[in-house]
Amino acid sequence: MHLWDRDHYVLEDIHSHCADFTSRIVFGRLTENAFNLVEGSSLASFLYRFDEGVGHSVAVPNGHVEGSLRSSRVLGPNEVYSKTAQELHNVSDVEVGTVTVSAWFQRSHDALVLKGANACAEDCVATIGIEIGELRLVLEEIRKRISAK
């Protein structure tokens, strides 16, 4: 499950995933963008590999490239989108309160992430989390929204 609950939205990096997935928009709206990888140097490329030793993915520099927008589409409630592990994409124009639920297949590939040209592997690290009490409140609010449908 993914909840976009902030008043401001940071544009996602262009990225792929380590596994195929299918997502359904439960509430809200977003734009799903698909990209092609092309020769160039404006974006730093990183491979995300799962490191068994540390128990999480790590970023490995992978040169420089360009990402060329192939298509965009606006998706709303009850719409579904699927991506194979190696498809480059991101989402944009996400409505606050958007909730998606995803089903993931088994990890099969390294993920690819494209960042600004001067990015380094450390720029790919993000610590995220939520206190258990806040998580309970968020999940209860989502449950109420689903029940009200």
Residue ranges: model-predicted function:
Residues 32-33, 83, 88-94:
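Short beta-strand His + acidic residue motifs that chelate non-heme Fe in jelly-roll/DSBH
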Residues 14-16, 93-96:
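Short glycine/proline-enriched turns and hinge-like loops at secondary-structure junctions
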Residues 18-32, 36:
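Short, conserved beta-strand element in jelly-roll/cupin
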